[in-house]
Amino acid sequence: MKRISLLLCVSALAVYGVALAATQFFDLPPLPHPSQYGNVLIDRQTGEMTMPSVSFSHSSHRTRYTCRVCHFELEFMMQANATEITEQANRKGEYCGKCHNGELAFGHTEEYCVYCHNFGMDGSQKRFEELSNLPWEPYGNEIDWDLALESGLIKPKASILDDDFQPMEFTSMLELDADWGLIPGAEFPHDKHQKWLDCANCHPDIFNIKKKSTKHFDMKYILEGKYCGVCHLKVAFPLDNCSRCHPKMSG
Amino acid sequence: MKQSRLVLFVLLMFCVSSVFAQAVGTKKRAPKPDEYGNVVINNYSEEAGISPVVFSHWLHRSMYTCRLCHVDLGFAMEAGETLIREEDNRNGLYCGACHNGKKSFTTKVLDGKEPDNSNCDRCHSQGKDIVPQKEFYEFVKDFPRSRFGNRVDWLKAEELGLIKLNDYLKGVSIKRGELKYPSDFEIDAKFNEMPDIIFSHEKHAVWNGCELCHPQIFSIKKASTVFDMQAIFDGKYCGACHGSVAFTPMDCQLCHSTEIK
């Protein structure tokens, strides 16, 4: 009798586990309005400080600079509020202050406070309309940023610290087998990523460099914001666009 | 009894897998420039009711070569591996070779005077608000910059004479004749698209001599040590220094520097 109840207990746990995985697999996070996709609220110190929290728009910055510039050269972390940005650091020319110094971009003077410290009620909607000439894609910002870059419609700088910077040419295309039998495999183009990112943005923290040696790399964790999900949930094109990674999938 | 153990085991596996999953697939926090190369040594400290030691590589490497501590003084290359005791230091081993009241501060009883316990905190400093005598950012402000780690190009700083490295400690080191270092050589990158590596013996020898790497980390016969980049990221081979103290291997092109074919 004890054995049967134990078996029941274990199988119930297993069913629960599978159900959990399945709901997470199909439960994509809701998408905001295209103009709001990639917007980040930085409220690390709200409550302690008198200034309202900061809203940051990825779409208005990535037309000018690649991801590499901020997330590598300026050392912004890949998660909201994880970077210890302070007003003092900005004024010293770190983080936002590297550009927002009154020369490259508006500075840290009183009339501009509200440009960033605005509780997310910012003007990104208006700025977003300026991007209406960029190629369309169905999800996220509804902008095909890759195509915009390749066709020269935007020319983001890949470095602000080194004028002679040349990214390494690395074009290897990886074929990734899907874990589920009926799902066609995914493709990973290094070259498309290299145009925006530095090797060190992904390696070795997020992905090992040795093929097939990254553990727990599956959709469940990607949907939790790990692996590809570090970018492809909130900033780069979202996971709703299955066929962009799994080319043989419809939809 | 057996069954309840099994249930416990299954539950434990669930917990472990969910905790483990937290640590993978995300970007780690990069240490601040002044934290890079800091090592916490806590073999015996907490057990004895004292704060663990925080050792700053940047402060020491601005005065001494790596070789002096890691070869002549016998410090291991991994935190906690050396098993340093207070008694060792007082006998002039390890830290005590310099921290003896002559070369640098000490807590030892000197000439029958009371020991200066105010110095304890200067090393046993974890969790304490200790203001160092040399402030990192002030110290490195005119140094050539690099992209990672301490954000200091230590190699260039040494070449420019901004820091002068001492490679000899009286009573510990033994002077030998100079050796001519082998010339730079190329190491083939395993992956076709990666530029090959140029390894400079000379640049390394300024800091490390020969003994720090040979023969334990690298055999001396060319191409006989088989290693790959993942092993380096895991702290082996070049990763024994590059990633925790010397510039990090995330800066690909610093080593993969040949012309692209």
PLM segments and residue spans:
Chain A
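Positively charged n-region of N-terminal signal peptides that target proteins for export
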Residues: 1-4
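Bacterial N-terminal signal peptides
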Residues: 8-16
